[in-house]
Amino acid sequence: MTPGVSLPLAPVGADGRHLYTCPFCEAMCGLEIQVDEGRVAGIRGNRDDVWSRGHLCPKGTSLGALHEDPDRIRTPMIKVDGQWQEVSWRRAFERCTELLAPVIEKYGIGAVTAYTGNPLAHSFSLGRYTGVLLGLSGIPISYSPGTVDQWPKNLSSHLMYGGWWTFPVPDIERTDLLVVMGANPAASQGSLLAAPDVMGILSEIRQRGKVIVIDPVRTATAAKADEWLPITPGTDAAFLLAIVHTLLDEDLVNLGSVADHVDGLEAMRAAAADWPAERVADATGIPAERIRELARELAGTERAVVYGRIGLCNQEFGSLASWLVDVVNILTGHFDTPGGAMFPRPAAWSVTVQPIPGLEDGVPQFGRYATRVRGAKEVLGQVPVSCMVEEMETPGEGQLKALITVAGNPVLSTPAGHRLDAVLPDLEAMISVDLWLNETTRHADVILPGLSPLEQPHHDDLILQFAINSVANYSPPVFEPDDPDRPHEWEILIRLTGLCTGTPAEDVDVAALDDGFFDYLCFTQGLDGATICAQYDHGGPERTLDMTLRTGPFGDRYGENPDGLTLDTLKQQPNGVNFGPMVPQVPQALGTSDGMVRLAPQYLLDDLPRLAARVARDPDELVLVSRRHLRSNNSWLHNVQALMKGKDRCTLVMHADDAARRGLSTGDVVTVTSTGGSIEVPIELTEAIKPGVVSMPHGWGHGKAGTRLAIANGTPGVNTNILSPPDFLDEPSGNGALNGIPVTVTSSSAAPGS
């Protein structure tokens, strides 16, 4: 265990030096925050942090501005005759009861749904207690950004390893050849890959080896790589199948240390037999010989790894692509070994990653229920988030009448968000747990504000499940809440849970529900909940964190290992503790009953005919892909002035040759049309994108009446999700295909009806 250096720190709420872990992304940068006269005076990287060692990005420096944002909601609000009124917490909970209880009494709990947003993954309180709301409220179907994000990876990991969050991550600190597909860590800082200063690590790889980026766009990551291979969107699975074909055809397969724990090699051989490099070269845009060369490079390099992320997930063959990345790593001997793809060993396990009852052992028993309108089947407890709007729009028995949103803005972040924007006012009840009056929450009847990140502790449970080192780092709050008697976010969720089950929100026994949740978590670890609960004089997320640390791989297990980790001992190390890099964990990390990696799950093999039918594309077709920016995080950091500086980022990027054929120039306003809808947006020409591909960022579309986002509304941008057809999906997982959307682009002056 490597502890950090300890220097004098100010107590919570006092002026002076504070340490805090940035909660915005997988980089989890350690911050040093200076507070003067009760305000954030400066933020810099904490050089003593055992994880990030002083690294930080622009988002981390914005925490003070976020905390002090005058638009941030600090007091509960209810809507009266169309106008917002600030009220007491008790009155806000009473209003929740007045709204939601009649809906449940009249229509049943099936008329209620919840949407939980991306910030939950980084929230100390919400991340641990969303499971209480979704698991105990009785709400039958809820929605999340998971099905416009990583759900294909959840699916492939469930089928291969028997755990829906059992993700192998690239050991980038020890690899010599890194192949990046559909990821841009220069902007994301890593995704489903937690590492400090990813781009710095990539520079180190280049000094001793090689970095290759395969992407339709020459991203900031690709610009700093040794090689950029532009690929046609949606063909990644075909490309990877050709890699697999070469490995098998040229006898390059080496299962390495996991040879005795891999099942399905012959099924994989049969599946790849029809996918030689020559078959996919034209479709992918990558020459057949380069495909074969890359297969040989991967097989011939001792420490190499392929890393695929959101560009592979958010496409119509996301499950196949996510699966095949792992297949290539396994077949080349770069699985469960240093420098390859390895399973992390987090110091604290996350409550999010608990097995789903009935789906243990990686069984493909999906479709346990389906949506009313489309008949979309459940996969791993989720249905496509794009189904939510049609379930509200379509009359009849089972129509959604009430919505609870938690830290989410689905009007901007989900397919057909413009339709959701139109139907939300028709709901009979809408309750939002949120910090801002945004494009979604403006439709709510009640807004229950959470705390600023700096007003609550932090420990990144979920993100540390993807970390290349076993690290734990607890951050105390920097400030006390403005109202010391206000409920914390976890208490809000428990009250809403009780309300859904028939108890008025204002009368819910928060402690009893919290103890019941804690008792269940203890049970999953083979502990007696009553005995363990008696050791605490408090509940809430700190109790949960202590238990997950103590029952983790380095914990004291409540006295069984006296020198083990506890929350109290972690608090004594304000710069964190680092237990070292990933270690081989097969078969222990597997959740399959036979301890085997299932290389060729039949559920995924059954999707190959669909790929075969779609792999050949119209060469004149334009397709849209998404992009992100270092100073943005989905839709929720656009109200920070420091992050909004510079030129307009919400543009359609197009290759100069494609623009010339259409008579377009940089700065022109164009109409972009898909089967999902149409938008107008300025165009920006570049050579750094594959011809036939256009790109837009997501998370924009501000400027709507009734929002309270002064800075964001000054640079509203356009909502690209209007172009996302709700039924354009990765069929095995139900994940939205937000990349590879066929579009037309015309000058707005020439567009019919413009």
Task: Place the predicted regions along the sequence by residue.
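N-terminal export/assembly segments and adjacent metallocofactor-ligating motifs
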Residues: 1-250, 287, 374, 378, ...
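Flexible, glycine/charged-enriched surface loops at secondary-structure junctions
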Residues: 107-111, 253-258, 305, 336-343, ...
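Catalytic, metal-anchored helix/loop core of enzyme active sites in primary metabolism
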Residues: 445
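Internal, active-site/partner-interface "lid" segment
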Residues: 252-274, 505-523
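Long, contiguous, secondary-structure-rich segments that constitute the structural scaffold
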Residues: 477-551, 635-653, 657-754
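Active-site phosphate/pyrophosphate-binding segments
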Residues: 243, 261-385
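Extended redox/cofactor-interaction regions of prokaryotic respiratory oxidoreductases
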Residues: 127-203, 207-214, 238-241, 327-442, ...
